[in-house]
Design a protein with these regions (language model features):
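Short amphipathic alpha-helix used as the core "switch/output" element in two-component signaling
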Residues: 61-72
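Acidic catalytic/metal-coordinating carboxylates
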Residues: 33, 59-62
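Active-site residues of response regulator receiver
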Residues: 52-53
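Alpha4 helix (beta4-alpha4-beta5 surface) of REC/receiver domains from two-component response regulators
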Residues: 62, 81-98, 102-106
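Two-component/phosphorelay signaling modules centered on CheY-like receiver
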Residues: 10-29
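The feature encodes the CheY-like receiver
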Residues: 56
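Conserved acidic carboxylate
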Residues: 7, 80
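Acidic, metal-coordinating helix/loop segments flanking the phosphotransfer/catalytic sites
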Residues: 30-48
Length: 109
């Protein structure tokens, strides 16, 4: 499984990458905004996207429909610190939601 991490905070990207790689999951890349995200997919592939709901240049509710149209097989899991976002994320087309406060093992499940 190839995973792409999209988060504007370098420390969050590094922590997620470390947790995933310790479990033998291949992190194909990481990006900090939606422009980088869309550019990355022009030359790369991923099976799963861990997407920060609040990227600085385009929120998840706008970027998920674009990704769904271009990459229908891509699984999208939204990361956010607010539980209220769960309903919005699923309505926008996300496959799942993980709170940034959840234990890392929850992400792996």
């Amino acid at each position: 499984m190839q995973v792409l991490i999209a988060n504007d905070q370098p420390s969050v990207r590094s922590a997620l990458k470390l947790v995933l790689e310790q479990q033998g999951i291949d992190v194909a890349g990481d990006v900090s905004d939606s422009r980088e995200l869309l550019a990355w997919f022009k030359t790369n592939q991923a099976d799963l996207l861990l997407l920060d709901w609040e990227l600085p240049d385009q929120p998840g509710k706008q970027i998920i429909p674009i990704l769904r149209a271009r990459y229908p097989k891509l699984a999208v899991i939204v990361l956010n610190s607010r539980q209220q976002t769960r309903t919005e994320a699923i309505a926008a087309g996300a496959d799942g939601f993980v709170s940034k406060g959840d234990h890392p093992e929850y992400l792996l499940s």
